[in-house]
């Protein structure tokens, strides 16, 4: 019997996949527990519609990421921190501080985990911070750390 999986079933199929399984397994387990539905014309057309919708959403998300990349690459985030001799900071500027400053000054919300900053910024001046907006889109944000008065 052909079924369309509504959820991932370990060893059998992934969500949205159409597969042939034993009749008893389909009726007594998959359909009964709501893990799959019978693959009839109505359900197949609904699956196609859902896949098209997901594809459109993925394209829209990619476009939003590209637009955000354009915006971020034109901005400079300015932060101030206490520093000692030679421009070394006491502590460091973290991705959390950068994300908060970006939200406060430019009204752009970016998750701190998307800022790919290894150890934090430990010196005064300009630093380019990579921002992973989407698996296919990466922007570079310019961060200026100046001395706190």
UniProtKB/Swiss-Prot annotation:
The keyword RNA-binding applies. Keywords: Ribonucleoprotein, Ribosomal protein, RNA-binding, rRNA-binding. GO terms for molecular function: rRNA binding; structural constituent of ribosome. It comes from the Bacteria. Belongs to the bacterial ribosomal protein bL9 family. Binds to the 23S rRNA. InterPro entries: Ribosomal_bL9, Ribosomal_bL9/RNase_H1_N, Ribosomal_bL9_bac/chp, Ribosomal_bL9_C, Ribosomal_bL9_C_sf, Ribosomal_bL9_N, Ribosomal_bL9_N_sf. One of its GO terms (biological process) is translation. The keyword Ribosomal protein applies. This is Large ribosomal subunit protein bL9. Disulfide bonds: none annotated. Coiled coil: none annotated. HAMAP family: Ribosomal_bL9. It holds the Pfam family Ribosomal_L9_N. One of its GO terms (cellular component) is ribosome.
């Amino acid at each position: 019997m052909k079924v369309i999986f509504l959820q991932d079933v370990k060893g059998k199929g992934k969500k949205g996949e159409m597969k042939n399984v034993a009749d008893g397994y389909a009726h007594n387990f998959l359909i009964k527990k709501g893990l799959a539905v019978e693959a009839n014309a109505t359900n197949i057309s609904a699956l196609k519609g859902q896949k098209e919708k997901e594809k459109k959403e993925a394209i829209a998300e990619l476009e939003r990421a590209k637009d955000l990349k354009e915006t971020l690459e034109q901005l400079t985030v300015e932060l101030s921190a206490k520093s000692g001799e030679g421009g070394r900071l006491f502590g460091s500027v973290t991705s959390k501080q950068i994300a908060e400053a970006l939200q406060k000054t430019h009204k752009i919300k970016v998750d701190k985990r998307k800022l790919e900053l290894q150890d934090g910024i430990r010196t005064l001046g300009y630093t380019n911070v990579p921002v992973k907006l989407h698996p296919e889109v990466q922007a570079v944000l310019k961060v200026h750390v100046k001395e706190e008065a």
